[in-house]
Amino acid sequence: MPNKTAMIKRNSDKRLTRAQVRVFQKNIYAYYDAHGRDLPWRRTRDPYRVIVSEIMLQQTQVERVIEKYTAFIKLFPDFLALSKAPLKKLLTVWQGLGYNRRALALKALAQKVIDGHGGKLPSDPAMLLALPGIGKYTAGAVAAFAFNKPVVFMDTNIRRVYIQAFFHDRADIHDDEIIPFLEQTMDVENPRKWYNALMDYGAMLKREQVNPNRRSAHYTKQSPFENSNRQVRGRILKILVKEAPLTQARIVKKTGMDPERIKKNLVQLVEEGFIKKKGRSFAL
């Protein structure tokens, strides 16, 4: 449980004293040293493995990623292997993670690293941002976890920690208000450990308290998966991985879903490069 006596009241000018920073860091590290998670991507400094884990973790629970990550790394151990991966093989190992666009983006990223960076992932967050599938958070996370750079970035767990610590009497809190606290409390000597500790502390807060993120101006609930287009697309791809080519009528029959929704999603999957249409049939 968090040490409530160590929670710091927010200064009106957003400036913290050195003592306040020390208390905050001590509280976070105390929890991490006792309860930090042993995750496979935390046992490596390989930038390739770090970026694979970060893309897998986008909008996906840690528990679901662990098994898939290990299998993925065995099949595609580096950027070169991933860049040459057949789409069918890639989507087969990706099944169960959802958001299949990430798999295509990761393959495209691997090709960019091979072609534009000599097979080595850049450490500069600005250069990382230029790669497929990489947003501001992922660029910062990769810079910190792979290269131990003291860059400022935020995810849902980190946001939760800072809202709970510094904004306990507030609602409708914007990330721009949180950033100054992130900057002041950064452990610049070991940002890798610091961010791991923040994330584990934030995950604990979600389990043991009313979620502080509900007071964030950016808080939204994830849309239900059941009967969503994500579910439709996932079923189509799962079928085509196992059996192809298939006509639209056969896909409708195998999924048992609405023909119009199948038609719409087939068109989108073709446009996005997931599948190909030849005549009346579809395949990877």
Residue ranges with predicted function:
Residues 233-240:
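Hydrophobic residues on short alpha-helical segments
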Residues 8, 13, 17-21, 25-231, ...:
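Catalytic cores of DNA base-excision repair glycosylases
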Residues 270-282:
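A short, conserved structural fragment
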Residues 266-267:
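Short, hydrophobic-biased segments on the C-terminal half of alpha helices
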